[in-house]
A protein has these predicted regions:
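Bacterial N-terminal signal peptides that target proteins for export
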Residues: 2-11
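Bacterial N-terminal signal peptides
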Residues: 10-20
């Protein structure tokens, strides 16, 4: 029997863990699906230059990542246990050392946006190990792959019920929006879209921002831009901006939880970040 696109996926797909973005090897690639043709024209219809879009997809670095699609298709609810590794004396010591090393930048960001430096560092700790683990998946390839996962050639090979198929269609629409924003940003600033790597879900930089978050909350610490989320200064300022826009008030501890929850809709994540901030 002929193998389908996903029957060729290697067994033993990695267990998902959003906080372990760099621990896995990049997903293997396959030939681009036919659905990429429609995706390219969709991006052009929404305002991107046709030549730019076609050149990007025709680049030899452009690859379809079936493993990433499968991860999203069969996404499991995270276990609170995945955050236990952060609540240790060693991690707390690393956070305090980071606070001391980046004190000037943290204080400037905290003053400008009215947030707590300790919360910024706690988020950086969980998201990327203070910048040491930002992910290895090419961001363009992730979003391009996810953007077509609702196409018949792909979805038919996934054994999903009606609820699963509906969720996949919503995630594909989300990925198309994120891809549009990502390419718009790269084109506007003349950045190589293949130079960005991140998590299997497309989050990038030390702060693990999605392209839409980069657009709305990305801040250049020196005010010159473009924003580089793979630098400590810009990641710190961008997190501070995100928390501020999420309602963070330094003197209102209840607002801390609400703002951090806006960063990641997980009670266990919020508990971990707040606990680390208190330890710092």
């Amino acid at each position: 029997m002929a193998q389908t696109r996903f029957s060729r996926v290697a067994a033993g797909v990695l267990i998902l863990a959003a906080v372990q973005v760099g621990g896995a090897a990049p997903a293997r690639a396959e030939a681009p699906p036919v659905a990429y043709v429609g995706l390219k024209y969709d991006l052009v219809r929404h305002g991107l230059d046709k030549g730019y879009v076609f050149r990007t997809f025709d680049d030899p670095r452009s690859q379809f990542l079936p493993d990433v699609v499968r991860k999203i298709a069969f996404l499991r609810k995270e276990s609170p246990d995945i955050y236990a590794k952060f609540l240790t004396p060693a991690v707390a010591a690393q956070g305090r050392a980071y606070l001391a090393a980046h004190q000037a930048t943290l204080n400037r960001a905290a003053t400008q946006f009215g947030v707590a430096p300790e919360v910024i560092v706690a988020i950086l700790t969980v998201e990327s190990g203070l910048g040491n683990n930002a992910g290895k998946y090419p961001v363009f390839n992730v979003f391009a792959s996810l953007a077509v996962m609702d196409s018949p050639e792909i979805i038919q090979d996934l054994d999903l019920d009606a609820v699963g198929r509906d969720r996949l269609k919503k995630k594909a629409a989300w990925a198309r929006r994120e891809l549009q924003v990502f390419l718009e940003y790269c084109a506007a600033h003349r950045l190589d879209p293949f130079s960005y790597c991140g998590s299997w879900a497309g989050a990038m930089g030390f702060c693990q921002f999605l392209p839409s978050s980069l657009k709305s909350c990305g801040v250049s610490a020196n005010g010159k831009g473009p924003v580089d989320l793979f630098t400590h200064d810009d990641a710190i300022f961008s997190i501070a901006c995100y928390l501020h826009k999420s309602g963070f008030q330094r003197q209102n501890r209840a607002s801390w939880r609400r703002a951090v929850y806006g960063y990641n809709h997980s009670d266990a994540y919020v508990d971990t970040v707040i606990t680390l901030a208190e330890w710092y």
